[in-house]
A protein has these predicted regions:
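Short acidic, glycine/serine/threonine-rich loops at helix termini
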Residues: 68-72, 117-120, 211, 220-222, ...
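Thiamine diphosphate
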Residues: 244-266, 270-272, 486-494
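Extended active-site and interfacial segments that coordinate phosphate-rich ligands
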Residues: 7-8, 121-126, 132, 214-216, ...
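Flexible, low-hydrophobicity surface segments
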Residues: 1-155, 176-179, 254, 264, ...
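C-terminal catalytic domains of large/alpha subunits in multi-subunit enzymes
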Residues: 51, 61, 73, 81, ...
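Conserved catalytic cysteine-centered active-site region
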Residues: 93-95, 230-238, 263-274, 278
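Conserved beta-alpha junction segments in alpha/beta enzyme cores
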Residues: 166-227, 326, 445-469, 477, ...
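Glycine-rich loop/linker segments at domain edges
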Residues: 5-8, 74-86, 152-196, 287-372, ...
Length: 767
């Protein structure tokens, strides 16, 4: 079944923020800091305020007078000692703490006039010392971003697991293996840059925000907090969203400021960011350094795991910036039996753009760490890396399996995933292929990565299904598609639940006036949680419809059977169609006495457990030692996403996730220099993979239905990004093993590989 959205989007009829304009509209532009850390001595806006077409210029002084609050922080680790979440101002006042931080807002009749006026604002800065990288920020005497409030630049400390059990495991271990890995910072490269349009109705005193966001209802809540007003004063309207990947989850200053400016000036105010804005203001992802130690007995069984992670928060804690560093920890053992685990996470402030959730939100970081550590353990113990995994993998008969960090895996065939992947990629025949590559002066390697994700828990979703008199169904749901294909998926679920034609289902998202509640989209929960809520709503409709059908057919409702859109008296051929029943539902004469006309249903789903999508990624590569160039020859995904709703949508999600994972592993590096200047501020400098660099991806499906979900779904949105980095890096390290290289940090650029080969070769020559 093809995507319902595609015709609209491919023929230019999508509705993105920049497609919208309103009468008498004004345009906003933002002056951003050129310094990573500086005291703002003076701001002279006089020339800008008198420039042609300029209606207003606002600074932090104006924001303070208006009484607007800072950006809210939605998440802080709960079991940590009290951390410090600094005030994240809408406009920086006294000090700016990263390149790109907003300092002033210009409002003008045209975008060009706003940009020209912005350039005439004179700011006097007093540069301050910076702490940019994690090592620098943590070093003795490092400049502190928040003196007296976040000593040593530590925003929070979080610990989980059983340290005493780990100490015992390490004491009894025959082998100890350790590794240090860098999970490189990445910039979000969604095809649609951020944007927002603010409107205010003076009569109703309500404000409307058109924007690109993954979470309309949480955004409304944040606006209410900033303005210190009830949520009912705000409406969020979201059309099509051109990619999100997590960076459009949390709120940004521009969304609040255009809304405030619209109130102040009594006219709509529009701001559309460009790609340069995106690179230095969109929340970045990943960026952590982790040390891990694995204890094993003499046979190679895992005994204990000790993890010490340092995560880069940036200059502030964004809405969900503290989530990713701790989000992965409860499931750190993943597919393996590891009796004792302890994790320590330290969130650090640096003079960089804040980080936030990015596709996978911590799970890819943990999977990468563990799969690299296992490969290193196999090398150190001289054990086959497949057999080491097989020895420690959780068998099907152990499920449900409770991990030492409190999760309970309820389904999955982890070893079968591994076996099917090994067979399909011909792992046994690899050495002959390695020899063939060597005859051409190339180095060939093969790698794999097992994974389990935890998704879809802690999120309650409401759904309303509204049936019209002609039998058409409207789905009102509080998730928010940003490219996944929700219109198709929800229409398909509705069609299967109610027996209506797929084309007769309309899906409405992104309107907080029409949809009472919602959590937005993230964590691969939209289909597992949203679909389950739809099932509950459909059951309400079917129950009422059976009562109506019984009245129409002169039978008891308990004798009515529903199948494929028809209601039939059991054991007879007496039936009524969906369309006929829908029409009757709006005719009081044809309804049982006292029944309210209409055929709507509201459903809610409260998950009792996470879903656990799982699988195995396998990758085969070849590299040229003379240039360091790495080529991906084959890429295979064995996946278990529970019941598969739409294979095309699923494969699209995996394609995209793998592309992003390979991008991080081989190409992307959101890097800063020592002064805090961003050195990858355009696509000339920030290297996302081209289509020709993404391999053809092979798929094997091994589904086991999720027992915690009435429809059996597990969620698939982030799995590709989780499995790809370790699979590729493990393959590359395997290709480099002849040089004595047992680890190389991402991204695996040709320059980095070439330098490592050169260094290893020179070392051997000297010896």
């Amino acid at each position: 079944m093809r995507r319902k959205e595609d015709l609209r989007l491919l023929t230019g009829r999508g509705r993105y923020v920049d497609d919208l304009s309103f009468p008498n509209q004004l345009y906003a532009s933002f002056l951003r800091s050129p310094h990573a850390h500086a005291r703002i001595v003076d701001i002279d806006i006089e020339k800008a305020a008198s420039a042609p077409g300029v209606c207003a210029v606002y600074t932090a002084t104006d924001i303070g007078r208006a009484g607007l609050g800072p950006l809210p922080v939605s998440f802080m680790p709960e079991n940590a000692p009290p951390g410090y979440a600094p005030t994240f101002p809408l406009l920086a006042g006294n000090v700016t703490r990263y390149v790109g931080e907003s300092i002033a807002m210009v409002i003008a009749d045209s975008e060009t006039q706003a940009l020209l006026a912005q350039d005439s604002i004179q700011v006097t800065y007093e540069p301050l010392a910076t702490s940019v990288g994690l090592a620098e920020a943590a070093s003795d005497g490092a400049p502190e971003l928040w003196p007296g409030k976040a000593p040593f630049n530590v925003g929070f400390l979080w610990e989980g697991g059983d340290m005493a059990a780990v100490v015992t495991a390490f004491r009894e271990a025959e082998h100890l293996v350790e590794i240090d890995v860098i999970n490189n910072r990445v910039a979000n490269a969604s095809i649609e840059c951020r944007g927002a349009i603010g409107l205010h109705d003076q009569t109703s005193k309500r404000s409307t925000l058109y924007t690109a966001s993954q979470m309309p209802h949480p955004l409304r809540k944040d606006l209410a907090a900033i303005f210190d007003e009830p949520e009912k004063n705000f409406q969020i309207l979201i059309g099509d969203v051109g990619g999100g990947f997590g960076s459009k989850n949390s709120m940004y200053v521009e969304q609040a400021l255009v809304l405030w400016a619209a109130r102040m000036l009594g006219r709509p105010v529009k701001w559309i960011g460009n790609r340069s804005d995106a690179f230095i203001t969109d929340y970045h992802g990943r960026d952590n350094a982790t040390h891990a130690e694995l204890a094993l007995d003499k046979s190679g069984n895992f005994l204990g795991l000790l993890v010490d992670e340092t995560a880069n928060l940036g200059a502030y804690i964004s809405g969900r910036g503290a989530m990713s560093p701790v989000n992965n920890q409860p499931a750190l053992a993943w597919t393996y039996k590891t009796p004792a685990i302890h994790v320590r996470v330290r969130g650090m402030f640096t003079n960089t753009v804040p980080t936030d959730v990015y596709r996978g939100a911590g799970r890819p970081e943990a999977i990468y760490l563990l799969e690299r550590l296992i490969d290193k353990a196999a090398d150190q113990l001289n054990i086959d890396r497949v057999e080491l995994r097989r020895k420690n993998i959780i068998p099907p008969n152990a499920l449900p399996y409770k991990t030492p960090l409190g999760l309970t895996y309820d389904s999955g065939e982890f070893e079968k995933n591994l076996d099917e992947g090994l067979s399909q990629i011909d792992w046994q025949g690899f050495e002959s292929r390695r020899v063939e590559s060597a005859t051409r002066g190339r180095k060939r390697g093969i790698g794999l990565a097992n994974y389990v994700e935890r998704c879809g828990h802690g999120v309650t979703q409401d759904v309303e299904l509204k049936v019209s008199s002609d039998g058409r169904v409207t789905v009102l749901i509080g998730t928010m598609s940003n490219g996944q294909g929700h219109e198709t998926a929800y229409a398909q679920i509705t069609s299967e639940l109610l027996g209506v034609d797929f084309e007769n289902v309309e899906v409405i998202q992104g309107n907080t006036d029409l949809i009472a509640n919602g959590k937005g989209t993230g964590g691969s929960w939209s289909i597992p949680v949203g679909g389950a809520a739809m099932s509950a709503a459909a059951n309400v409709i079917i129950d009422k419809a059976k009562t109506i059908a019984g009245h129409m057919l002169e039978a008891a409702s308990v004798d009515i059977e529903f199948s494929e859109g028809s209601f039939t008296v059991a054991g007879t051929d007496r039936t009524v169609s969906w369309n006929s029943l829908a029409a009757s539902a709006f005719d009081p004469i044809q309804l049982p006495k006292g029944m309210k006309p209409g055929l709507d249903g509201t459903g809610e789903f409260v998950p009792t457990n996470h879903t656990f999508p799982n699988g195995c990624h396998l990758c085969e590569v070849e590299l040229d030692p003379a240039t360091g160039t790495l080529h991906i020859l084959r890429y295979l995904v064995v996946h278990d996403f529970g019941v598969v709703l739409n294979p095309l949508l699923l494969e699209g999600q995996i394609h995209g996730g793998v592309a992003q994972g390979l991008g991080q592993a081989a190409f992307e590096d959101a890097r800063y220099d020592k002064t805090g200047q961003f050195n990858a501020g355009s696509f000339l400098d920030y290297n996302i993979p081209r289509a020709s660099q993404i391999p053809s991806i092979e798929f094997i499906s091994n589904p086991t239905p999720c027992p915690a979900n009435p429809l059996g779904f597990k969620g698939c949105g982030e799995a590709g990004a989780a499995g790809a980095p370790p699979a590729l890096v493990n393959a590359a390290v395997d290709a480099l093993k002849d040089y004595g290289i047992n680890h190389i940090d991402m991204p695996l650029t040709s320059e980095k590989i070439w330098l490592r080969i050169k260094s290893a070769t020179q070392t051997k020559t000297c010896v």
